[in-house]
């Protein structure tokens, strides 16, 4: 199993339990689905219900959302406007280039060449995107983007993450 973590915060962003596609060698698209889960009662194996106190019974709580977001405890965040998002992208890209120059100089040109196209595309779709940080909620790290696309007549959630802002860990 592979898990991709934010290189700046160490937060888990997604794993290979989902369909993962690399776009222009700079952006991962992670295909999720909308799920609802019941967060029910805890059952203790071996407990004798007749010897226990009467259970008052509670309504089982449910949570629903995108499986990637729920499973990796991503936290929704936002940008006030496109200008604020653009500022974040420029600052984050500078951090990535600096890190690439230190750790992986052969990737710098590919990154710089392809990232401009991807950034223009993201800015054009700004109003259709949701934004998520990792569990630590550190906005200095990677902010993943989520959009919905119509695939085979179904609205499919797709998480977008910058490849160079992640490290792959195998378990």
Curated annotation (Swiss-Prot):
Predominant place of localization: cytoplasm
Domain of life, source organism: Eukaryota
Molecular function per GO: calcium ion binding
Keyword Cytoplasm: yes
GO cellular component: cytoplasm
Domain TCTP positions: 1-171
One protein family per Pfam: TCTP
Keywords for the protein's UniProt record, in alphabetical order: Calcium, Cytoplasm
Localization per record: Cytoplasm
Function, as annotated: Involved in calcium binding and microtubule stabilization.
PANTHER family linked to this entry: TRANSLATIONALLY CONTROLLED TUMOR PROTEIN-RELATED, TRANSLATIONALLY-CONTROLLED TUMOR PROTEIN
Family as reported in the entry's similarity comment: Belongs to the TCTP family.
Protein name in the entry: Translationally-controlled tumor protein homolog
UniProt source species: Aedes albopictus (Asian tiger mosquito)
